[in-house]
Amino acid sequence: MEIFPAIDLKEGRCVRLYQGEFSKETVMNEDPVAQAIIFEKLGAKILHVVDLDGAIVGESVNLPVIEKICKAVRIPVQIGGGVRSLAAVEKLLSVGVEKVILGTAALYDKSFLEEAVRLYKEQIIVGIDAKNGFVATRGWLDVSEISYIDLAKQMESVGVQTIVFTDISKDGTLAGPNFEQLELLQKSVGIRVIASGGVASIQQVKRLNDMNIYGVIIGKALYEKTIDLEKVLQVTKLC
């Protein structure tokens, strides 16, 4: 199982939100580059970075910080937030990003998604963020009428190989992931599923591993030290 330490960028800083509410932010580190280096030194094999400002405005706002992170670490970096054009994908890849996560665009711009997958294959990941089982977009401000399962099936049919699933109600809460929704998702598609939102303990990570979930994104639990990164990496290595 892959462990993805999370760095959420807002106004150039590393922050955490509560249930996706931009008004409920906590600054975890004023220097996201330093935070990336810390995670790498603790043994992280890959980083998950989200441009929260970008998710709202629809373009990469924190690109200079993202580029600095990519240059500062030797491990792969995957980026999401506001990526809604091929030019945006190409720009991120050109500054050293390994994989790009599409969210809103995957739902509303099928031709862009198909072209991105055709050109960049497994480097394109789709983020599916759900509220009460329905897909939320544009920085989680809008909720669509499509279920997360239906969108996941559509993504699989297009050729997407990996999806990141977030239950927004769990994000930043340390209340545990939505195991029920993840289990249904895992049974509904044959592509890799990365779980995100609410993970608070190594026991929960083990349970996700037992469900054959491909990876887990851990944010608040690392910053608040309810999960020790070195320990969870060791545990998942042995699983």
Swiss-Prot record:
Highest taxon of source: Bacteria
Reactions mediated catalytically: 1-(5-phospho-beta-D-ribosyl)-5-[(5-phospho-beta-D-ribosylamino)methylideneamino]imidazole-4-carboxamide = 5-[(5-phospho-1-deoxy-D-ribulos-1-ylimino)methylamino]-1-(5-phospho-beta-D-ribosyl)imidazole-4-carboxamide
EC number from the UniProt entry: 5.3.1.16
Enzyme class name: isomerase
UniProt record, GO biological process: L-histidine biosynthetic process; L-tryptophan biosynthetic process
One of the record's GO cellular component terms: cytoplasm
SUPFAM superfamilies documented for this protein: Ribulose-phoshate binding barrel
Active site: residue positions: D8, D129
Single GO MF descriptor: 1-(5-phosphoribosyl)-5-[(5-phosphoribosylamino)methylideneamino]imidazole-4-carboxamide isomerase activity
Location within or outside the cell: Cytoplasm
Pathway assignment: Amino-acid biosynthesis; L-histidine biosynthesis; L-histidine from 5-phospho-alpha-D-ribose 1-diphosphate: step 4/9
Keywords from the UniProt entry: Amino-acid biosynthesis, Cytoplasm, Histidine biosynthesis, Isomerase
UniProt signal peptide: none
InterPro entries, sorted: Aldolase_TIM, His_biosynth, HisA_bact_arch, Isoase_HisA-like, Isoase_HisA-like_bact, RibuloseP-bd_barrel
Family to which the UniProt record says this protein belongs: Belongs to the HisA/HisF family.
HAMAP family per UniProt: HisA
Name assigned to this protein: 1-(5-phosphoribosyl)-5-[(5-phosphoribosylamino)methylideneamino] imidazole-4-carboxamide isomerase
Organism whose genome encodes this protein: Bacillus mycoides (strain KBAB4)
